[in-house]
Regions:
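A glycine/proline-hinged amphipathic helix-loop "lid/cap" segment
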Residues: 1-115, 357-360
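Alpha/beta-hydrolase superfamily serine-hydrolase fold, recognizing
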Residues: 9-26, 98-114, 118-360
Length: 360
């Protein structure tokens, strides 16, 4: 068995030299016990017994290649590396009938967006999507597959927003651009053929933060969203909860990433860590739209997102909370290489639509 696994390890290394995507898809086909053994051979020493075995293998490969964390001292280089990694795992995209890049002429400045429509001849609700990436990296291409899955399986239009990134812009500018994009959707609801003016916001990680901050700021405004989908959102820059210390090493999101994000998004712009502009858990939660909150069990952000969901419920907000215990931060971005991640993301898409329909 050891000889066989060593040979497979060498095969995986060869595939890695050619491209991360083929290697990852080969890993995903292995039985769980084989993945566990391979993770050990690759040197993954972190004790997370309940973590998905495929994720262990992928993290072992990342660490072996010296890629720990995704945000570093050079934001531009961090963006390049993140874009490269996401490009490396791409394969055939989920089919959506209409995908179009458009320009949004907003009061805060012109930005780009990508519009997905699974049935262009039908009126459908629209989901305004803000991508993750610590407010520093990411864009339309890095989250293209996620948006395609949301459009197809939630049966909604998706407008993915290419908002300006920190540290070049302040949180005030970034959030204003995202709120202006939501207002633009409402103002153009007839041209977009939005079913019964049904508009919601969604995002992963930093995008979840943006979604719920925008939702708070737009309460009682004409363009207030009807629902919010928050996928492992960051909502509290000030506090450090037990999950931060339990899962800050050997996983996708590290304590180093959190420190850099805090520096680029808060400290450099003199924003207090408990300002609701960046930490919505300290904001006014009254009259917030129904919230569908997703967490990953092995994630530094797990506890703050769970606490936020409790706060929403205590403030009378209709809320659904769902945890994926064996997953870590960023799992929805692994859909091109992980069947389980894709299954979970499809499940989230379908269940969110049911939740939205029930609470609209």
């Amino acid at each position: 068995m050891e000889i066989g696994m060593t040979a497979f390890n060498q095969k995986i290394q060869t595939l890695l030299d050619k491209g991360q995507g083929p290697a990852a898809r080969a890993l995903d086909k292995l039985p769980r016990l084989a993945q566990e053994s391979l993770a050990k051979i690759l040197g993954y020493s972190y004790q997370y017994p309940d973590l998905d075995s495929f994720t262990k293998c992928m993290m072992a490969v990342q660490i072996k290649q010296g890629r720990i964390g995704f945000i570093g001292s050079d934001p531009i280089e961090s963006r390049r590396q993140f874009d490269t990694q996401m490009l490396a795992i791409r394969q055939k995209s989920t089919e959506v009938d209409s995908v179009e890049d458009i320009r949004l002429p907003l009061q805060s400045g012109t930005i780009f967006a990508r519009h997905y429509h699974p049935a262009p001849n039908k009126k459908l609700p629209l989901l305004v999507f803000y991508h993750g990436g610590g407010f520093v990296v990411g864009g339309l291409d890095t989250h293209d597959e996620v948006c395609r899955i949301l459009a197809k399986y939630a049966k909604v239009q998706v407008l993915s927003i290419d908002y300006p990134l920190a540290p070049e812009v302040s949180p005030q500018h970034l959030i204003q651009s995202c709120e202006d994009a939501l207002a633009w959707v409402y103002q153009n609801r007839r041209q977009l053929k939005i079913l019964k003016n049904r508009i919601a916001v969604a995002g992963d990680s930093a995008g979840g933060n943006i979604s719920t901050v925008v939702a708070q700021r737009s309460v009682n405004k004409p363009y207030a969203p009807q629902a919010q989908l928050l996928i492992y959102p960051t909502v509290d820059f000030k506090s450090r909860h037990p999950s931060f210390y339990a899962y800050n090493e050997g996983l996708v999101l590290t304590d180093s990433d959190i420190n850099y994000v805090t520096q680029y998004y808060a400290t450099q712009h003199n924003v207090e860590l408990d300002d609701p502009l960046i930490s919505p858990t300290y904001g006014n939660l009254k009259k917030n739209p129904p919230a569908f909150v997703i967490t990953a069990g092995h994630d530094v952000l797990h506890d703050e997102a769970k606490i936020y969901s409790y706060k929403l419920r205590q403030n009378g907000v209709k809320m659904h909370y769902e945890e994926y215990p064996d997953q870590t931060h960023g799992f929805i971005n692994l859909t091109p290489i992980s069947k389980k991640a894709k299954r979970y993301t499809i499940e989230i898409s379908k269940n969110f639509r049911k939740f939205w329909d029930k609470n609209s």
